[in-house]
Regions:
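Class I S-adenosylmethionine
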Residues: 6-168, 174-179, 187, 198-200
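Short SAM/SAH-binding signature in class I
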Residues: 184-192
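Flexible, active-site-proximal loop/turn residues at the rims of small-molecule/cofactor binding pockets
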Residues: 195
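A short glycine-rich, Lys/Arg-flanked "PGG" loop and its adjoining helix->strand segment in the class I
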Residues: 204-206
Length: 206
């Protein structure tokens, strides 16, 4: 980030000096666009499985220091720590142990017994699967096959393989799937189909 700041200052200074020279200014502007975002976007597009497009948008898998992240547009779909099995099994971001959903999942055995039936709308990277306990029955509802592929099949994220190797995944619109399920088939249902700060009221109400 410090290096980027220095480069930005240099480009800004050169830009000021070339304001009168149209060709030089355009060339400098193009270089700035490539340096700040464009190059990274192009390199991600060329990496195998780093970008995946589906009917629902573009998914981007990017690596940071000690973690891997899945983005859908501007929304973070999940972050997994890397470096050891224990780190890979650790729920992160808004699924962390102290979060609301984390506390609900940890309380499930006491509230519903060792055979609790857990449903999750929205698979993401599969983070919530690491709250699964022996004897529980978990079911994920996911509308996008691309998300299932990223979370389960590519090996980029290992929440499912580490914590719940053979999950039940219902592919399709969760509203339809839940309507088809028999009444009282779940003890705990987590809704994780939000898109950024846009709340899906059609899932929150009758």
């Amino acid at each position: 980030e410090e290096r980027q700041g220095t480069v930005f200052l240099v480009i800004a200074a050169l830009g000021f000096l070339t304001i009168g020279a149209r060709a030089g200014f355009v060339l400098l502007l193009a270089a700035a666009l490539v340096l700040f975002g464009g190059y990274r976007a192009l390199s991600l597009s060329m990496e195998r499985d780093a970008r995946m497009r589906s009917y629902f948008g573009v998914y981007t898998v990017r690596d940071g220091p000690g973690y891997r992240e899945l983005d859908h547009g501007s929304t973070v779909h999940g972050i997994q720590l890397r470096g050891s099995v224990a780190r890979e099994r650790t729920p992160t971001t808004y699924y962390a142990v102290g979060s609301g959903v984390g506390q609900a999942m940890q309380a499930a055995p006491a509230l519903y017994g060792p055979s609790a039936r857990i449903g999750v709308v929205g698979l993401g990277t599969g983070t919530l699967s690491c709250y699964a306990r022996p004897g529980q029955r978990w079911r994920f509802y996911e509308i996008d096959p691309a998300v299932v592929r990223i979370a389960r099949d590519t090996g980029q994220f290992t929440y499912l393989s580490r914590c719940l190797p053979n999950p039940e995944i219902r592919l399709g619109d969760a509203r339809v799937a839940l309507a088809q399920d028999r009444s009282n088939s779940l003890d705990l249902l987590a809704l994780d189909a939000f898109s950024s700060d846009s709340v899906p009221m059609h899932l929150m109400t009758r």
